[in-house]
Amino acid sequence: MISLERRLFCLWIFYKYMQRKIGQNRKEWYDYMKRLIYLDHAATTQPFPEVLDAMIPYYSRYYGNPSSGYELGEESKRAIETARGQIADTLGVEDDTIYFTSGGTESDNWALRYAVQNGKRRRPHIVTSSIEHHAILNTCKNLEKQGVRVTYLPVNKEGTVQPEMVERAIISDTVLVSVMYANNEIGSIQPIRQIGQITHRKQVLFHTDAVQAYGQIPIHAKEDNIDLLSASGHKFNGPKGTGFLYARKGLKLQPMIH
């Protein structure tokens, strides 16, 4: 049996090795970044230093389970609720309408599947555009296999969806209109407010994939009549693997994972 002293010695050796290795990797990374001119921020962004500084304490000191009842967990819970409130403020909505997810893809899936399940139609119908992110398009294709009907609207030469086409596409079985706020490849910004006015008048849920827009341009969820909105942290200098779904007050989301 290995003695405690020997185990501690081995751990110390491993620690020193990793410390040296991390130092080398960090230097190599800094040298690489000095040579790099990065212009692909539409794909992803580097976390701001203050983002990393804000996160580190919760990987070391405040690592408690936020659902626990002791102080260490309460500290984590306060941080989560503070972040939730900050996000809500940017959209002008209530704190309890923000649901954290692993990113834009999960948020998009949750929004579309919620609308279908909650729509209470025998053959639900979705209206979306032909230039949506694959998180929307692939989810729609999957839902079509389950009997959901989907209308894919074309865009004009500016890459935008015409609101009048959205209005014509809505039928009695339409449970959702989903149009991205800004396109991730050509940058076209959709007429969200006009589309929101139509869906509100028609009493159809309106979802927008705002992954490419949130943090870049002001978004007013209530004024735009947005019922559901997706966003992803890595697109606005936040950590990867984080995102959120906004669901208008009164919408009762069902969990996707049980």
Each language-model region and where it sits:
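C-terminal active-site-capping segments
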Residues: 7
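Short, Lys/Arg-enriched N-terminal segments with co-localized hydrophobic residues
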Residues: 13-32
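Pyridoxal 5′-phosphate
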Residues: 26-258
